[in-house]
Structure formats: structure tokens, C-alpha cells
Amino acid sequence: MLSTTEQIAFILLVAVCGVLAFQGFRRIYIIVSQGKPSYRTDNFTLKLIKALIDVGLQKTVFKSRPIVSIFHAFIFFGFSFYLLVNINDLLEAYIEGWTTIGSSNAAALGFNLFSDLFSILVLVGIIYFLIRRFVGKPKVFEFNSNVKLQDKVAQGGIRKDSLLVGIFIILHVGSRWLGTAFHLAEREAAEWSMPTASLIAPLFFGWGGLEAGIHVTWWLAMGLIVIFLPYFPYSKHIHIFLAPLNLAFASPKANGELMEPSDSLNPGASNLDDLPWKNIFDSYVCIMCTRCHEVCPAHESGTPLSPSALEINKRYFINQNSSDLAGGKLKLDLLHEAISSDAVWSCTTCMACVEVCPVG
């Protein structure tokens, strides 16, 4: 249990970071709302349920890159379970005597076992992705040299975001796992329901810093989540929450179906707010995995088109100018900031990018 001072400090931290995060999400709503009307809410409840099931089973992720998708599933299922873990850790911090460690209750034993195993799976998954991005450096992450990119993207912005989130996950999950080992060491006992934490717990038997270690690891695990909240609306990892919504907003029409002829004297879109709101929302949901340009025949043949770069450029420009865009003081010129005219005319409208996209 946290001290009274720590409890108050945590509540204040949640309040401050919560307000900052709310402002970020509010800007997203305002900017997306500036788009043209697009009726995507018919049968929305049923479509959202289907989207949640598809996401829960990782069906959209496993459409390609099966090995990568397995490691993604480690993180997804682990983090999904960690919602319960974080709730439990909050209860431990604020309710005297609350703990699942040492309990003989079947639910507590099952919770401890899954917490322990999922901690390892998440750590294995995130280490795999960090090695893949920073050591393996697969060619699929590269853009053709003639593809238009926002300056921050060209300077490695995606890699920096991936590194920051990777470090956050390792510290969050690793600290929680280590804190469990400290709790076991405090009791000088191993438990079968926490096999991996029990392996390292004996290393800390009799250590005088266990109480401090338990508090430090709690703050690293839980405090980092709260501190990360204001950054979340600007990170590509916001897709965790937005992907199911985007899948539910997907058009019921078949991919590749011809659009109705337009009577507009200015068809198409020159600025961000000329796009339907769904196309603005897409830029927030994009995970920047580049699966789309991996299957794009135009990109693979060396043209300046990258479906991934289009969404990434939109997102980076929005992130850097969100206040002005939300306030109506600035417009995003798509041909200047997001895509070149040559890239537009390189598109074959084959819809391969849409078919492979794991987030709709």
C-alpha cells in the first residue's frame, strides 16, 4: 500500500496528465470534424461488435506477415490482460491488505499465473520489435527516395516514436514483473502461480531495500502510464483504441467499386478539410507498419507513391500544427505537405493497400 503522501501525489498526477490528454483527444475530435460529411454510422453497434471481435482475435493483423503478427499478438493479449493488472495494482496501492500474492483463491491464482506469463510474452514481443526495427532494419520500412515526406518523418520521427514507446513498455511491464519478485522476496517464498517472478525472487531474499524497491517499481509501472497519457494522442500507438472504431466505420461498399459521378466543379481534395472526415480519421489510426506500400504495385515499381507516406505525412503535419488546425487558423495543403501530384497519378486504384491494412 502507498503512503498517504504517495496516494495524493498519484491522484494529482492523474488529474494533471488527464487534463492534458483530454485536450489532445479534443483536438483530434475537432480536426476530424472539419472534414466533409461521410455517413458511416449505419448499423454501427453491430459493426463495432464485429470489429472488436476481429481485433480481439487479431484477424486483421494476421492478414500478412505471420511471424511478425505472432509477436504482435503477444503484446496485444498481454496488454489487454494488463488492464486487469493495472486495476489490481491500484487497489493494492489504496486498500489496506489488498493483494493476490499468497492467496489460495482460485481466481487470484489464475490472475497471478496469467500476469506472470503475459509479462514475459509482452517483454519478448517488444524486444523482438525493437530488434527488428533498429537492428534488422527490414527494407519494408524504407520509402522510395522520390516519395514526399514531412521533414520529421525523413529525420527518423517514426523510429523515435517506436523507441520511446518500446522503452515505455519495457519499463512498465518489466517494473511490474520485478515488483512482483520483490513482493515474493519479502515473504521469502516462491509461488507456482508466478513461475518466472519466483525464479528471480531468491536473488533478493534478505535485501534491506525491498520495501523501497516495491514502491519504486510501483511508481515506474503505474506512474509511467499516467505520464504517457498526454503523449498518447500524438503517438501512432493511439491505434490501440481507434482501430476498432475505424474498422466499424469502414465503407459497406466493395473495395474498388466505382464512385458516383460528381457534379462538383472542383472534384477531389486540395486541403485537409476537403476530405471526408473518415479520411482524416485514417491518419490518426495508421500504425505506420508500411504493409500498404509493401503490396502497392506503384511503390514497388519505384514511383513516388506510398499509401503509407500519405497517411504518415497527414498525421505528422496535424501533430505539429494541431492547435492552429483546430482553431481554423491553418489549412493543410495536401499536394504541398502530404503527397506529390506525380504520386497521385501513379495510383492504379487496385485497392491492395486497403485490403492489407490491419486497422481499416
Role assignments for model-derived ranges:
Residues 259-284, 291-294, 299-360:
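Ferredoxin-type iron-sulfur electron-transfer modules in oxidoreductases and energy-metabolism complexes
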Residues 1-270, 275-277:
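Membrane-embedded alpha-helical bundles of multi-pass integral membrane proteins
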Residues 25, 52, 127, 165-166, ...:
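Generic structural hydrophobic/aromatic packing signal, biased to beta-strands
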Residues 70-75, 159-161, 234, 282, ...:
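Short, well-ordered loop/turn elements at secondary-structure boundaries
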